[in-house]
């Protein structure tokens, strides 16, 4: 039993003890869970329903927020079991010291913030097959017939088994050769735990990628089934397990679309929380270079659209604002966002922001020309050919992007972050609209803003800003190759361009 002094010592600490002293938190304008956090954790440990792999910032505030909303409404009595596959420091430095609680900070465009403690993340486990304690616990969880879903935010790279030459990465090859009991990668760990479930109960389960990539469920399914097939070839698993994983009536891989801008934790937010009396809010940098804090700051708007294929039942996700629909509609929403309503605008601002010396995306919207550029990309050029998914209005979505989301001055999002890996994005973000115009009109000659965005990217690749000063390009796997193509171009000298950007198809 907690005594008076135990609670007083933990006043305004993000901990189970700390949030029991509700008065000070309320005075600071911070909402606390209305449900019994300890009971939810206890019940979830006994009967897990939802496991999540990849427990960083977007998971904590968005997916954790969904589970928190269901608990607040009383339509669920379970939280999420959190599993980290990559950066184990996150468990030791952010989850355990704060009793798995999250300080969720929503940054409103008017400068106000909404602050809420989330108690929906009930347990944090490291996906370490070499740790007997962690591995045993994970096996127990997956052996429970009541487990309904396992979801992922591990980034698109987390699903990749092979390199650009089509050969298995060395760490994946080791996972294939060593079998389920020595799994290390996210895909091998998941496949191994599905094998544990198969051996224990053969119960159905939904395996749901929530990463921001096209056809994410297909990517996840292909990687899991390939890992299982390789294990089968090596004699680690039988044909019956291969059949289990390949049967979507038993193991489904729903597609999804996720959208919520979640920048790295801002020092200004940490300072404001500490000034309000909350202790120990400083961000930390882990050994894997993850920049993370006890709090997560993010924008208010958020979208999660999921294909409704859950063979073992599911939480009532729609009660927390999740769009539950069919695969075709998920694909349409994703294409609407990626090819027209958000990502093409972001990329244009990213490359021009780097060239023009901006450090905040929102500040670019104060520039008349840049604001007009993205309005033309989204409205004048995008809307005539946009894919309409029906469940979300493209016009309302792009209006929110242009008038609320991008101009939000309190979102610490940078052009440099968004410019990362642009070579991997520019084709889908602009190419689909160009193709739509060619299909509609026979050519894309009437487009002005989209070609200007692509030209801006080529100019960005020269690595010289508008003042003639060198700057560092954001990380990009194609950067060196692209710079070679542009190596002869001199800024201000039109004659130095000799057609090096023209693509010649191999004969």
Protein language model annotation of sequence segments:
Residues 78-148, 154-159, 163:
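Glycine-rich nucleotide/cofactor/substrate-binding loop typically near the N-terminus or early
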Residues 286-389:
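A conserved active-site cap/scaffold subdomain adjacent to cofactor or substrate pockets
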Residues 66-107, 230-262, 359-385:
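Catalytic or ion-translocation cores adjacent to nucleophile or general acid/base/metal-coordination motifs
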Residues 221, 229-237, 242-331:
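Primary mode marks residue(s) on the alpha4-beta5-alpha5 output face of response regulator receiver
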Residues 503-507:
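Conserved small/polar residues in nucleotide/adenosyl-binding loops
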Residues 129-133, 138-239:
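Active-site periphery "cap/insert" segments of enzyme catalytic domains
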Residues 352-477, 481:
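C-terminal catalytic subdomain
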Residues 11-42:
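N-terminal regions that are enriched for targeting/export leaders
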């Amino acid at each position: 039993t907690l005594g008076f002094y135990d609670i007083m010592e933990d006043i305004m600490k993000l901990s189970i003890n700390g949030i029991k002293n509700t008065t000070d938190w309320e005075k600071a304008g911070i909402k606390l869970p209305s449900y019994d956090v300890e009971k939810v954790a206890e019940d979830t440990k006994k009967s897990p329903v939802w496991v999540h792999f990849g427990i960083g910032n977007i998971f904590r505030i968005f997916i954790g927020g969904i589970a928190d909303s269901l608990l607040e409404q009383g339509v669920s009595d379970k939280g999420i079991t959190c599993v980290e596959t990559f950066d184990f420091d996150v468990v030791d430095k952010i989850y355990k010291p704060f009793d798995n609680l999250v300080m969720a900070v929503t940054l409103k465009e008017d400068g106000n913030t909404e602050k809420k403690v989330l108690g929906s993340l009930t347990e944090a486990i490291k996906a370490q097959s070499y740790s007997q304690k962690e591995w045993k616990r994970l096996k127990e969880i997956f052996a429970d017939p009541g487990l309904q879903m396992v979801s992922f935010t591990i980034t698109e790279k987390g699903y990749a088994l092979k390199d650009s030459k089509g050969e298995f990465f060395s760490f994946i090859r080791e996972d294939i050769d060593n079998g389920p009991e020595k799994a290390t990668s996210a895909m091998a760990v998941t496949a191994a735990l599905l094998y544990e479930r198969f051996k224990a109960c053969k119960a159905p389960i939904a395996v749901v990628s929530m990463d921001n990539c096209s056809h994410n469920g297909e990517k996840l399914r292909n990687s899991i089934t390939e890992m299982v097939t390789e294990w089968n070839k090596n004699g680690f698993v039988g044909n019956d397990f291969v059949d289990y994983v390949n049967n979507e009536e038993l193991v489904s891989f729903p597609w999804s679309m996720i959208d919520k801008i979640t920048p790295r934790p801002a020092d200004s937010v940490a300072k404001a929380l500490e000034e309000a009396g909350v202790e120990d809010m400083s961000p930390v940098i882990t050994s894997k270079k993850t920049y993370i804090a006890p709090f997560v700051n993010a924008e208010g708007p958020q979208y999660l659209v999921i294909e409704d294929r859950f063979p073992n039942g599911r939480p009532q996700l729609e009660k927390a604002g999740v769009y539950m629909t069919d695969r075709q509609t998920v694909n349409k929403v994703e294409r609407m966002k990626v090819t027209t309503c958000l990502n093409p605008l972001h990329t244009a601002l990213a490359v021009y922001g780097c060239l023009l010396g901006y450090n905040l995306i929102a500040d670019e919207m104060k520039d008349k020309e840049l604001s007009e550029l993205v309005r033309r990309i989204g409205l004048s050029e995008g809307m005539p050919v946009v894919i309409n998914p029906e469940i979300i209005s493209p016009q309302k979505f792009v209006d929110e992007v242009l008038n609320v989301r991008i101009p939000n001055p309190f979102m610490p999002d940078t052009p440099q972050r968004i410019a990362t890996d642009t070579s991997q994005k520019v084709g889908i973000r602009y190419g689909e609209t160009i193709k739509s115009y060619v299909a509609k009109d026979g050519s894309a000659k009437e487009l002005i803003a989209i070609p200007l965005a692509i030209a801006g990217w080529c100019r960005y690749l020269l690595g010289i800003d508008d003042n003639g000063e060198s700057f560092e390009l954001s990380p990009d796997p194609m950067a060196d190759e692209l710079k070679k193509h542009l190596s002869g171009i001199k800024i201000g000298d039109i004659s130095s361009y000799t057609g090096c950007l023209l693509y010649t198809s191999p004969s």
